[in-house]
A protein has these predicted regions:
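Polybasic low-complexity intrinsically disordered regions
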Residues: 1-106
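Helix-centered, glycine/charged polyanion-binding patches within enzymatic domains
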Residues: 88, 93-161
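Catalytic-loop motifs flanking and including active-site residues across diverse enzymes
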Residues: 73, 143, 147, 169-172, ...
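Charge-patterned, long linear interaction tracts outside catalytic cores
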Residues: 162-189
């Protein structure tokens, strides 16, 4: 695939990797029409990405009909990105489960930097993370948010495809085009 070639042509450090998900609107109706019919927009596509924080390239992505839990994507993403030998994997509170933390620590052999949910009381890795959580490393997670911002600003946050299958492909295409866009920025430096 094209995305794999882009990643091969770039030097990826992979020391810090961040995970997150964001929605892309799927409605092609006008906002005014949505107000008139007194209905919210029907559905959206959830775009899950994992990025290399240093190069700001998307290493792995998946698109699914939303709303979905971020945890379903996380395990597959962690198994896919472990080839980069990350030292830290960053994610927001939505990814705070013992299963995800176990996968990060045991399979990827990395440290999880995920803030605890307010009611976290059990689990070996969850309790251990109270001592290993580093705010200065976690603060770099905002890079994944800025990538979503760039994708939605430059390549549009609304999918024009009417079918779910084409809408998922459109979202994946936006991710690949973002990587091409980012590669040109890296090469200009």
């Amino acid at each position: 695939e094209l995305n794999k070639q882009i990643l091969l042509n770039n030097q990826i450090d992979g020391e810090i990797i961040a995970l997150d998900g964001s929605g892309f609107t799927n409605d092609y109706a006008d906002k005014y029409y949505a107000i008139i019919r007194r209905k919210e927009r029907k559905s959206y596509v959830k775009n899950h990405i994992s990025i290399d924080v240093e190069s700001r390239l998307i290493l792995h992505f998946a698109a699914q009909r939303g709303p979905r839990f971020d945890t379903r994507f996380a395990i597959a993403a962690i198994r896919n990105i472990k080839k980069y030998n990350p030292k830290y994997i960053l994610a927001d509170r939505a990814y705070d489960t013992e299963l995800i933390r176990k996968c990060i620590n045991e399979e990827a052999k990395a440290e999880d930097q995920i803030p605890l949910k307010s009611r976290a009381k059990n689990g070996h890795y969850r309790l251990k993370s109270k001592n290993t959580f580093q705010k200065e490393i976690y603060s770099r997670r905002n890079n994944v948010e800025s990538i979503f911002s760039v994708i939605k600003r430059i390549f549009n946050g609304t999918n024009r495809s009417r079918s779910l299958q084409l809408s998922n492909k459109e979202t994946k295409l936006k991710n690949t085009i973002y990587n091409i866009y980012r590669t040109t920025q890296i090469q200009e430096k």
